[in-house]
Amino acid sequence: MPTVTISPTRCKTALNRTGIPGYRYCLNPYMGCSHGCHYCYADTVLRFSNRGSRWGEFVAPKVNLPEVLRREVRRKRGPLGSIILSTVTDAYQLAEEKFHITRDSLEVLSEEWPDARVDLLTKSDMVVRDLDVLKRLKNCSVGFSLAVPDDKVASELEPGAPSPSARLLAAKRLIGEGLKVWAFIAPVLPGVTDAQGMLGELFSVLKGAGIEEVYVDPLNPYRASLERLKAVYRAKLSWALRSLETYLSDPRGYLRTFSRELALVSKSHGYDLKLDHAR
């Protein structure tokens, strides 16, 4: 793993409007992400950060975000609206162990607006640490993002993230504590997520963890992340390269085929899923 540069910073705003359906605000406690997922679209923030580091090699903790959040929430009139953590970072990346910005922000929400809908999406089992705070939020859920169930394959694609098996253990723990937990199969990596038997195994482990709510999202071929992803496919996942090339040349056709497979495999494991993007 490359060295990650940590550069604490201060923010002017905490809650930012988001265009993600179902949410009014996003909350991003960090700029950058040490998970370094090769397919991540969030490296577009580099264009605005004046940082020369490559994606996955810098993290800027927004050290004053909890206090800014408290001021913003107190100024709100009427319902706060739904909040997603996070959209361009992982709120539970390694830096959170030291800076606890995510935990402090959740504390603020639990104190100032405990009825607010708060959904967390993470690749980290660290979220279990904050069980006590999550339980104080009356309308909170935790989503775990997984592209594959295989720890070794995942380590090639998500070198700084906790393993899928660690995430699933965390999901099972949260469910056992009464929290609402869901899974986000994202992105669908051509030739990998849908490799022979892989999709069935993924649904099997999700079911085994007790997860009943699942969402699916295809790969977004942003230029910068696509170059990184292609390099990983060539070096580590050569058996899937042809599928990636097929997807890039005809994404609609590929997704139509995948959507049919998704419907069949998910149904065989007790889910009922389709890919809206394939219509």
Each language-model region and where it sits:
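Auxiliary Fe-S-binding modules of radical SAM enzymes
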Residues: 1-10, 16-17, 194-279
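Conserved Radical SAM active-site core
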Residues: 1-34, 38-143, 151-152
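Hydrophobic faces of well-ordered beta-strands that scaffold small-molecule active sites
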Residues: 25, 83, 118-120, 142-144, ...
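A general structural detector for well-ordered alpha-helical segments in enzyme core domains, enriched
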Residues: 69, 101-105, 130, 166-171, ...
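Conserved radical SAM core fold
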Residues: 84-94, 124-129, 140-161, 188-192, ...
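Short, electropositive alpha-helical surface patch
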Residues: 99-102, 135-147, 193-212
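Surface-exposed amphipathic alpha-helices with a cationic face
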Residues: 110, 135, 171-177, 263-267
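Conserved strand-turn element in the central/C-terminal portion of the radical SAM core barrel
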Residues: 160, 173-195
